């Protein structure tokens, strides 16, 4: 009897020891991954994670701070964008900006882990709303980052206004038409295209250009930017547009347009993506001498400028950001980006815009004590005054949206060391980047 009792005691001791070991293991890092396009969820105490960039949906929860994992309710960031289709490259840039922001905060904020969830909408506005519905109603995101594509951003803001009311933080500029669905929740924090085009036209007129040819891919931003450009360059500056062409988005052979182009003082082009490099090369092959002026410098990345070589020198652009801006906040941002993406050169304005969208939302949470309720966090974001990588930014309530008062830059392609890149040559200081009514 005593022997059987002794055996029972020993069994209990072993079981208790095993239970304690399992409990200890429960505090260690755990990772569960399902390959895209299925959902990817990662929970880590000290593991650095990177969200997948293939199309589909992904959820990443990570707390990489050396101080240990955050334990509060997750803050969920949604990104509804065209990982496939003609906006895929732009989407990649924005994705890298979001990941840079998360890396800089060690994937946690105010004691809460930050989750990054994204969906591929193929840059289709109808699909974008379906994906937004999934992110909002199933994934329960707290904020929508993007979309970049203007028609998709307009449609998603309309859906958000009719559903959860969570804020939409834009990444790039948007046309004034998007104000019609802003619903008091859209933060167009990089500005309205119409005003951006206006300041570009103002600069070109002040530089003494009198005639211009305009050649654009036929999309919504092109029309908005050109309207602003013409107000300053033609209506106020007395200039003349000799030709104005809007061409299909997939065009890579520009010969029929270039051969008919009349001599002018400057050529304004809204050509991007796969067409950007061929356009500039063909422009020079046709012997056209007028300088190229590009609304928004992100249409030509450092990699594309390197491919073009010295023929890109002297190209002019406008934008709200360049990684060559000299201030301490930008130096920190650029260093963080280059640590994650050492082979890509410096961040462009889409990387910055996505980074700023994330940080602006999180700073709003800090201002309201961490309350993600739209009625609390939207006014908190609206009241922010921030020193950012592109300078001081304040938000202004405007036509049921929020637009920025910020510096706006004229840039020129110069060689910095051995690198061809965009360098600021003039600044419009603290201008309100709204629709035409906000221009001087």
PLM feature segments, named:
Residues 339-351, 362-422, 439:
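Segments of small-molecule ligand-sensing domains
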Residues 68-99, 119-126, 148-149, 215-223, ...:
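Extracytoplasmic "Venus flytrap"
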Residues 280-355, 366-368, 422-439:
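Extracellular/periplasmic periplasmic-binding protein-like sensory domains
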Residues 126, 141-245, 291-316:
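Extracytoplasmic ligand/sensor domains, especially the bilobed periplasmic-binding protein
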Residues 21-35:
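Bacterial lipoprotein signal-peptidase II cleavage site
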Residues 89-96, 103-178, 246-255, 277:
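Beta-alpha junction/loop-to-helix N-cap segments that form part of ligand/metal-binding clefts
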Residues 1-23:
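Sec-dependent bacterial lipoprotein signal peptides
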Residues 43-46, 50, 54-79, 107-113, ...:
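Immediate post-signal peptide segment of exported/extracytoplasmic ligand-binding proteins
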